[in-house]
Amino acid sequence: MVPGRVLMWGALALTTVMSACGGEDIAADHVASYGLNVYQSYGPRGYFTHEFDGDEQFYVDLEKKETVWRLPLFSEFTSFDPQGALRNIATLKHNLNIVTKRSNNTAAVNKVPEVTVFSKSPVILGQPNTLICHVDSIFPPVINITWLKNGHSVKGFSETSFLSKNDHSFLKISYLTFLPSDDDFYDCKVEHWGLDKPLLKHWEPEIPAPMSELTETVVCALGLIVGLVGIVVGTVFIIQGLRSGGPSRHQGSL
């Protein structure tokens, strides 16, 4: 990746569901981005997504020319014609070519992405789980995310499209289904113009070390001692209670 290349991006038909008289001091209950369009000059690529409250609803695969829903269930309630996205991207490409010819271009500032890896649910050995690689603060939106298992590349992972943020950077999430084992470790590999070299974010299951026989013996002995002390203390209190209450039963009027 060459960080010196020029990247320009545009957004058309970007709608934010907020109050008509709103301002920065008014917080919206829900925010939706309809038709976020991005086209980049480094290659024939672009992005078209719909988002709601920061979550992707769908994106349009510009190569396959089809709508890809974040959850298949969404397609049962509504639909979207990908031709609209293709027309928007074509318009962006045309306008970008004009702008680059008529203006002095400056290279975009490359941000260093922030990478976090965690499991979807608590790890239990032998139980299927999902690893999540959360890549934040992406700009420009050009990135390659892959997974390594024990140092070797693996396939079968999925990822979201670029999700927009208020600071005009992006985030992207990659998912890898795996079977936890104490013999395996994983790395999320991120390549981006803001990095001098590929970044590997390491993850391996945190399995409590088994107690040694000596530790088990000590724990059992302590438990037994505590139990015996409790019995002795309880017996002493019972005897004292009987003694203090005994004479009162023999007292009477003369």
Swiss-Prot record:
Regions crossing the membrane: 217-239
GO biological process, any: peptide antigen assembly with MHC class II protein complex
Membrane topology (Cytoplasmic): 240-254
Residues listed as glycosylation sites in the UniProt record: N104, N144
Cysteine pairs bridged by disulfides in the record: C133-C188
Region (Alpha-2): 121-203
PROSITE patterns, per the entry: IG_LIKE, IG_MHC
Region (Alpha-1): 24-120
Entry keyword annotation includes Disulfide bond: yes
Stretches of the chain found on the membrane's Extracellular side: 24-216
Domain Ig-like C1-type stretches: 113-204
Signal peptide: 1-23
CDD domains for the chain: IgC1_MHC_II_alpha_HLA-DQ
Subcellular location: Membrane
Protein's membrane topology: Single-pass type I membrane protein
Any Pfam family: C1-set
Chain residue ranges for the region called Connecting peptide: 204-216
Gene Ontology MF, one: MHC class II protein complex binding
Protein name as annotated: SLA class II histocompatibility antigen, DQ haplotype C alpha chain
Organism annotation: Sus scrofa
